[in-house]
């Protein structure tokens, strides 16, 4: 699902909200989450999951075209850990689809 598809679904299910309002709300939420992670903070949405940063240590990689060794710097990458309710729902829905 893309961001525009998400906006469309929310507008369809919430008839009182305009497309512009939903788009602004989603853009604002994503911007706030990005800023939070950029400053090293953790985000927890109960029942859904948590977002945090994981550190990838410096390492030696390979250029796939030449096979030459390349030194890669350490970096932080965003990580999502689904909450129990989300995991249960995904497995429940997957289980139902497998039997239909």
Curated annotation (Swiss-Prot):
Region annotation Disordered: residue ranges?
81-100
Start-end of Basic and acidic residues biased regions: 82-100
Q: Which UniProt keywords apply?
A: DNA recombination, DNA-binding, Transcription, Transcription regulation, Translation regulation
Q: Gene Ontology cellular component?
A: chromosome; cytosol
What is the superkingdom listed in this entry's lineage? Bacteria
* Any GO MF annotation of the entry: DNA binding
Entry keyword 4Fe-4S: no
**Biological role:** This protein is one of the two subunits of integration host factor, a specific DNA-binding protein that functions in genetic recombination as well as in transcriptional and translational control.
Q: Which NCBIfam families match?
A: hip, PRK00199.1
Name under which the protein is recorded: Integration host factor subunit beta
**Which species is the source of this protein?**
Pseudomonas putida (strain ATCC 47054 / DSM 6125 / CFBP 8728 / NCIMB 11950 / KT2440)
């Amino acid at each position: 699902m893309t961001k525009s598809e998400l906006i469309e679904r929310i507008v369809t299910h919430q008839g009182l909200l305009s497309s512009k309002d939903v788009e602004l709300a989603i853009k604002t939420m994503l911007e706030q989450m990005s800023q939070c992670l950029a400053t090293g903070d953790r985000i927890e949405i109960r029942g859904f999951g948590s977002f945090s940063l994981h550190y990838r240590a410096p390492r030696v990689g390979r250029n796939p075209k030449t096979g030459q060794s390349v030194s890669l710097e350490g970096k932080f990458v965003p990580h999502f850990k689904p909450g129990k309710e989300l995991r249960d729902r995904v497995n429940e829905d997957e289980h139902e689809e497998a039997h239909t």
